[in-house]
């Protein structure tokens, strides 16, 4: 700890902890941290590309696409569609010859809603003024957040590429009732780069 502390004072860099994860397997990348509290105006963190995954959280039609839940319920679609282009730019860069893994998550429920908790269904109906998960709203593509429906799938602009992972989940958090944790362990992932929606719910619950 003392050695890493002294290194940080000199370089403003959180060094990759080889003592914890072992030797670097891919490229050692260094990124700037903005607005890092208690560490000054600027700091950097190192991570191993081979142990890193981009997580694209719930970029589904229901949340950010035309005729999805957010759209047909009259909410401001630009708020959830705004991240599409930046995420696409990130994916294009990652897919261009890097060994960083890409993992998409997709929230949804069985057609019979057997995996939908009572409180989640009730809350969705309250927020939707009577239209909740499993219902087909007027103007919508299909039942809201039901697996297999067109509006449940990931938007075309961010369609997973061959070899990328898609984790289906029934909860807000990706670790609950899914293969997310097992997949990270299998791939040897130690660092996550988070993208997607929504920051205060499905993204935050992974962190």
PLM segments and residue spans:
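Active-site acidic carboxylates
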Residues: 1-160
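Conserved beta-strand edge residues that scaffold enzyme active sites
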Residues: 108-109, 173, 198
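Internal catalytic-core helix/loop-beta-alpha segment
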Residues: 140-192
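Active-site neighborhoods of divalent-metal-dependent phosphate/nucleic-acid chemistry enzymes
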Residues: 185, 198-199
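Short beta-strand immediately N-terminal to the catalytic nucleophile in serine-hydrolase-like folds
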Residues: 195
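Short glycine/serine/threonine-rich phosphate/pyrophosphate-binding segments
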Residues: 199-206
């Amino acid at each position: 700890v003392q050695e890493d502390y002294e290194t940080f004072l000199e370089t403003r860099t959180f060094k990759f902890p080889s003592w914890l994860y072992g030797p670097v397997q891919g490229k050692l990348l260094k990124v700037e941290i903005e607005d890092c509290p208690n560490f000054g105006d600027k700091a950097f963190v190192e991570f191993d590309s081979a142990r890193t995954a981009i997580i694209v959280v719930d970029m589904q039609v229901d949340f950010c696409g035309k005729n999805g839940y957010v759209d047909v319920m009259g909410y401001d679609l630009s708020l959830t569609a705004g991240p599409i282009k930046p995420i696409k730019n990130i994916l294009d860069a990652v897919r261009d010859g890097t060994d960083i893994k890409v993992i998409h998550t997709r929230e949804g429920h069985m057609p019979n809603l057997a995996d939908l908790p009572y409180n989640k269904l009730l809350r969705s109906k309250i927020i939707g003024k009577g239209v909740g998960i499993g219902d087909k709203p007027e103007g919508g593509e299909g039942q809201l957040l039901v697996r297999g429906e067109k509006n449940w799938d990931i938007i075309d602009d961010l369609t997973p590429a061959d070899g990328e992972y898609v984790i289906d989940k029934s909860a807000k958090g990706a670790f609950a009732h899914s293969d997310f944790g097992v997949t990270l362990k299998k791939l040897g992932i130690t660092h996550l780069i988070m993208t997607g929606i929504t920051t205060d719910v499905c993204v935050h619950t992974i962190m």
